């Protein structure tokens, strides 16, 4: 089927809708960011892109720190609200009834209600155009214990995380596979893998009998 061609734009969807906290425990702000992601594995690095005109831009640039807080259905309203209101005018933590949580390595607060909070240290700022990209090293990851399973792994299916796509917020549906599943060999039932055993030849009928 033919595809419709559009002019260049931002159409890589879905992407995370995160709440980035910045500043310190006294003077802090939350900026909602969709231009964010992973850029390196070792060392673990991520990025956020922010317009220089945003109130949070100077807070992040001056401190060189920020926290990425993942969002879920419960935080959807606050996520959107913190993206359309300016920290110059309102205290977003207070207005959205969000609780500040002390981080381990950075001075800016984490958001207590977030399923996962990621402490980040800015390593470089790239001025790209409409947005400046903050390249940052991940210092620590804090996951809410209620989302940790009995094996100590993070169970993302319990978080009810939200994503942003073409102007809307969406919840993640369900897991349909895991990394490498396309080349993974199917597990066979060991009970059906019993070796064939050759029995004694029947003198009367003169044939070999096999059994599974």
For each predicted feature, which ranges?
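Basic, polyanion-binding surface patches
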Residues: 1-196
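Aromatic (phenylalanine/tyrosine) cluster motif
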Residues: 207-210
């Amino acid at each position: 089927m033919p595809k419709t061609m559009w002019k260049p734009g931002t159409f890589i969807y879905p992407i995370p809708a995160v709440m980035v906290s910045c500043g310190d425990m006294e003077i802090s702000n939350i900026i909602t960011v969709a231009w964010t992601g992973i850029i390196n594995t070792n060392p673990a690095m991520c990025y956020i892109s922010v317009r220089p005109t945003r109130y949070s831009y100077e807070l992040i640039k001056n401190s060189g720190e920020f926290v990425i807080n993942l969002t879920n259905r419960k935080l959807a309203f606050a996520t959107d609200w913190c993206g359309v209101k300016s920290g110059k005018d309102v205290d977003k933590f207070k207005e959205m009834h969000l609780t500040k949580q002390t981080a381990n390595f950075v001075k800016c607060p984490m958001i207590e209600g977030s399923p996962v909070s990621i402490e980040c240290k800015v390593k470089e700022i790239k001025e790209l155009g409409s947005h400046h990209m903050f390249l940052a090293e991940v210092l620590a990851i804090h996951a809410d214990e209620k989302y940790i399973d009995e094996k100590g792994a993070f169970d993302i299916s319990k978080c009810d995380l939200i994503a942003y796509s073409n102007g809307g917020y969406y919840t993640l549906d369900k897991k349909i596979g895991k990394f490498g599943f396309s080349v993974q060999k199917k597990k066979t039932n060991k009970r059906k893998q019993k070796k064939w055993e050759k029995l004694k030849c029947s003198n009367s009928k003169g044939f070999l009998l096999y059994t599974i």
